[in-house]
């Protein structure tokens, strides 16, 4: 069983409490993308990121100084969005950390696909950003089936905890033999099911922590996820989607 999740826009340079254990599989390709980004003007970068002048200036300065080989920190501690805060990987025991290194993959616009302890540096590039590429239409085209192939080499079903933006980098390449299971966290609003993004991000992080803490190996075991907000709904779930409804 392997989980896929999205990265976070907000990144930090993590402290040295947890060392880098591995390098990104597609570090060469990430270097190519970084070089293209570093050639952008301030205005082009702002158009790419859709950011304010102040945020663009900070990110642009960081971009010009970026070096993928220096001042790395583990990916799992470098992303600091809501999902990662609720995952709380720093609170996992050693066996839990080994579990996420083996079973969790982070999809990334810049790096393609990451293991939790791959060394990364802060960057700003979402999969849906329209970075001008010389031989490709967009980042989905740039990465092609490489991210799927990396997942396909791992045993077991793919548990999709990623946003649609990042799951789109995998879905087109799925084969009949693949077991791809979406996880949905929803609220009942006026008789309809609605996803509330912030709560869903919290739950995704908590589910990863739950799986790591219990060393889960079967997708069916995720039905026992003890979320403070959501409960598994067997009636709405299918073989390809696990549905959790707000209590």
Curated annotation (Swiss-Prot):
<dbReference type="Pfam" id="PF03883">
    <property type="entry name" value="H2O2_YaaD"/>
</dbReference>
<dbReference type="InterPro" id="IPR005583">
    <property type="entry name" value="YaaA"/>
</dbReference>
<dbReference type="GO" id="GO:0033194">
    <property type="term" value="P:response to hydroperoxide"/>
</dbReference>
<comment type="similarity">
    <text>Belongs to the UPF0246 family.</text>
</comment>
<protein>
    <recommendedName>
        <fullName>UPF0246 protein LCABL_22600</fullName>
    </recommendedName>
</protein>
<dbReference type="GO" id="GO:0005829">
    <property type="term" value="C:cytosol"/>
</dbReference>
């Amino acid at each position: 069983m392997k989980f896929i999740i999205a990265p976070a826009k907000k990144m930090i340079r993590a402290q040295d409490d947890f060392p880098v254990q591995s390098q990104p599989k597609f570090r060469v390709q990430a270097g190519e993308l970084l070089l293209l980004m570093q050639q952008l003007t301030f205005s082009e970068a702002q158009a790419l990121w859709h950011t304010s002048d102040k945020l663009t200036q900070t990110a642009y300065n960081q971009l010009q100084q970026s070096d993928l080989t220096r001042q790395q920190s583990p990916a799992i501690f470098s992303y600091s969005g809501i999902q990662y805060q609720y995952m709380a990987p720093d609170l996992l025991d050693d066996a839990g950390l080994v579990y996420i290194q083996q079973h969790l993959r982070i999809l990334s616009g810049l790096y393609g696909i990451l293991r939790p302890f791959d060394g990364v540096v802060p960057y700003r590039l979402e999969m849906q950003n329209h970075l001008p590429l010389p031989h490709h239409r967009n980042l989905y085209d740039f990465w092609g089936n490489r991210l799927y192939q990396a997942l396909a080499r791992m045993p077991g079903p793919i548990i999709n905890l990623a946003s649609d933006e990042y799951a789109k980098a995998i879905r087109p390449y799925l084969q009949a033999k693949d077991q791809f299971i979406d996880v949905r966290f929803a609220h009942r609003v006026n008789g309809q099911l609605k996803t509330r993004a912030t709560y869903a991000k919290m739950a995704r992080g908590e589910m990863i922590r739950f799986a790591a803490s219990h060393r889960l190996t079967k997708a069916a075991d995720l039905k026992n996820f003890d979320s403070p907000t959501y409960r598994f709904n067997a009636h709405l779930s299918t073989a390809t989607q696990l549905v959790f409804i707000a209590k």
